[in-house]
Regions:
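Binding-site signature for planar aromatic cofactors or substrates
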Residues: 1-166
Length: 166
């Protein structure tokens, strides 16, 4: 967990619909708070609150899968989550010069490694399999194409905005 800069957080709502949300930060951005406790800071992103809504209104069950660049095996963690806005806890988790908006406390109930076969087959970490950025239109161009609203930003403008909004 301390080596992972990226994970996927899965939650479910009260009807059983599942949401999976990518989460990232510096390696170890999810803090190990104790033998059965993880602390995940909530950073600004797309400003959707699906995961937290599911935790508060649904079962509270969460599952994570942690990735470490270059390592094919992943770590899977399951447990029960709750959301806190404890100012002292949030102040201890400043990253990119900003405290989190909230913290997800996860009471861990299961942890296990997942074999690396899927990542090996996908060649996810191989430079040879990486796709050139120019192959895909920017997210702004895709949204413009679907809605015809506004003016589409270039990929460079999108990336510049990402950097200022981390």
């Amino acid at each position: 967990i301390g080596m992972s800069p990226f994970c996927v957080l899965a939650t479910s709502d009260s009807d059983g619909s599942v949401d999976a949300s990518p989460r990232g930060g510096n390696p170890g951005f999810i803090h190990v708070g104790g033998p059965n406790l993880l602390l995940m800071p909530d950073r600004s992103g797309n400003n959707r609150i699906d995961s937290f809504r599911n935790i508060v209104e649904g079962s509270g069950f969460v599952h994570l899968i942690f990735f470490v660049p270059g390592i094919d095996e992943t770590l899977r963690v399951g447990g029960k989550g709750n959301v806190t806005v404890d100012p002292e806890l949030m102040a201890s988790m400043v990253e990119f010069g900003k405290p989190p908006r909230a913290v997800l406390r996860i009471d861990v109930r299961e942890v296990y490694f997942h074999c690396g076969k899927a990542l090996m087959r996908s060649k996810l970490w191989s430079q040879d399999s990486h796709v050139a950025r120019s192959v895909q239109p920017s997210i702004a161009e895709v949204i413009f194409e679907q809605t015809s609203m506004g003016t589409p930003d270039t990929q460079e403008e999108v990336e510049a905005r990402y950097k200022t909004q981390l």
